[in-house]
Amino acid sequence: METTPLNSQKELSAYKDGEDCQENGVLQKGVPAPGDKAESGQISNGYSAVPNPGAGDDTQHSIPAATTALVAEVHPAERETWAKKVDFLLSVIGYAVDLGNVWRFPYICYQNGGGAFLLPYTIMAIFGGIPLFYMELALGQYHRNGCISIWTKICPIFKGIGCAICLIAFYIASYYNTIIAWALYYLISSFTEQLPWTSCENSWNTGNCTNYFSEDNITWTLHSTSPAEEFYTRHVLQIHRSKGLQDLGGLSWQLVLCIMFIFTVIYFSIWKGVKTSGKVVWVTATFPYIILLILLVRGATLPGAWRGVLFYLKPNWQKLLETGVWVDAAAQIFFSLGPGFGVLLAFASYNKFHNNCYQDALVTSAVNCMTSFVSGFVIFTVLGYMAEMRKEDVSEVAKDAGPSLLFITYAEAIANMPASTFFAIVFFLMLITLGLDSTFAGLEGVITAVLDEFPHVWAKRREWFVLGVVITCFFGSLVTLTFGGAYVVKLLEEFATGPAVLTVALIEAVAVFWFYGINQFCSDVKEMLGFSPGWFWKICWVAISPLFLLFIICSFLMSPPQLRLFQYDYPRWSIILGYCIGTSSFICIPTYITYRLIVTPGTLKERIIKGITPETPTAIPCGDIRLNAV
């Protein structure tokens, strides 16, 4: 094909969007007919002039160093995009708003000073969580790649970050969907006239079962258990049939069937990509808000609701002097927004190039934080009602944390409300949809990463690859479906994600803002949005956000969690196992760095320079003209 050099800005400007153009100021005169497979031009990403693969020798002229090259860039092979902008927003909101917003935030809030906790939570969100959230959306949208291959365009030596993210996603899928399976089991059990966790007359109940809400006079002892607690522990989990991590017992076939159904729904929701998942989230992302509103109104009308709200929001300003409160605030906002999991990179990569990801970051972050806050009212109005009925203090009712808060305390409260069957059904449906959204997102992050890394292998076999991922996650979940599976869920939740994801996110931020460069990153953002991030964002990205992550990591390492579930204290060897699981994902990063330095030719200095220099250009829409210093 004949090519003509473009020697001036005027000549470049003469060509409009839609005309074929190649980098290094070369325009293709011929326009391929529809159906023809044309070569895609690439760009230099601001570092070096990269010849266009497949072009003739006459197009491969080097440009002297320290000069400015006019570069006309084209889009690479057509990438799937969201059908509508709202599909993307709902997917991100559905991912960020998960089960943790319902059970973790309310518990952490009242435990750390009530209304006073909102101050450190807001500060950590503004200076730590939201900047990292914005960073990942911008990176994904600009480079249009998943969490593995994107590093060849940023800082190749850190490609191990993508591998670590994928391994963490597998760990999460191995236990998170089990919690959804518990909710599904509760949902199925709710289709009865009398909810099965309201009485002590079932086959799984023990002599210690005592019903608070019984009309008969009761005597509550230290060994007494509620019907809801025994339904959860002895019927759903059957944890009494396990001796601990050393003897998990057999599989619960009921939970195996539940999780098979869940993975089937997941598969048919994501097998075709964002075109299908973007439609599913219209239900799974909006339904929880309808139910939250219903439960909020119902809870507010219950006797004693005001006691729960007062307990939830009454500020204890002295708590702010404790370091643990700030650590909990930082950890909560980080895990709530979810940077570092590769999901935001994947979702944003399907956006249009000039989509306003800055606005998206602010909107979705605000929605996520507000959802957490409102969920606290939903939970504590009901806890206040329970305290009123039991004639106890709210603090006595709100002892449970984590899944127990939902499956024991809240389930018991619902069971003793008027129209309990209806509220139980909608509540557990809400939990299922909250969980499914996050699972869609987590697996899509892995799928996008692998498909982008190996396009020639999996590009036309997405359905089969997704099936393989889902089956792998199903088999990985089996250990959590045993009678002692709840012990494994707790172990994975504490160690497989916490410190590992924080460390990965810290290295990601350092790689982007210190190696790729804050100026280059801001230039990329300006190219997409038309404006450059201000000094506030730059300071947060370069210094505050990395320190924010380092603060949480150091706090975790200095005060490792003392794990206890029900009456079971985790043995020391299980804590060591937990650290090994967490390290297994993080170790991907130094392993790849070592491998990269070994296989790259040249001196050590040359190897390092090559490792931190982008090797794969980023293509942007045709017609966009960049001034690249090369």
From Swiss-Prot:
Region: Interaction with RAB4A; residue ranges are: 616-624
UniProt modified residues of type Phosphotyrosine: Y47, Y142
Chief place of localization = membrane
Catalysed reaction per UniProt?
Answer: serotonin(out) + K(+)(in) + Na(+)(out) + H(+)(in) = serotonin(in) + K(+)(out) + Na(+)(in) + H(+)(out)
Q: Superkingdom of the source?
A: Eukaryota
Q: List the disulfide bonds.
A: C200-C209
Q: Which residues carry this modification: Phosphothreonine?
A: T276
Q: Output compositional bias ranges, type Polar residues.
A: 1-11
Write out the residues that bind Na(+) 2: A96, D98, N101, S336, N368
| Assembly with partners or alone | Monomer or homooligomer. Interacts (via C-terminus) with SCAMP2; the interaction is direct and retains transporter molecules intracellularly. Interacts with filamentous actin and STX1A. Interacts (via the N-terminus) with STX1A (via the H3 domain); this interaction regulates SLC4A6 channel conductance. Interacts with SEC23A, SEC24C and PATJ. Interacts with NOS1; the interaction may diminish the cell surface localization of SERT in the brain and, correspondingly, reduce serotonin reuptake. Interacts with TGFB1I1. Interacts with ITGAV:ITGB3.
Q: Which NCBIfam families match?
A: Na_transp
Function description: Serotonin transporter that cotransports serotonin with one Na(+) ion in exchange for one K(+) ion and possibly one proton in an overall electroneutral transport cycle. Transports serotonin across the plasma membrane from the extracellular compartment to the cytosol thus limiting serotonin intercellular signaling. Essential for serotonin homeostasis in the central nervous system.
Protein's name in the database: Sodium-dependent serotonin transporter
Q: Which organism is it from?
A: Bos taurus (Bovine)
Q: What is the lineage of its organism?
A: Eukaryota, Metazoa, Chordata, Craniata, Vertebrata
Q: Which gene encodes it?
A: SLC6A4
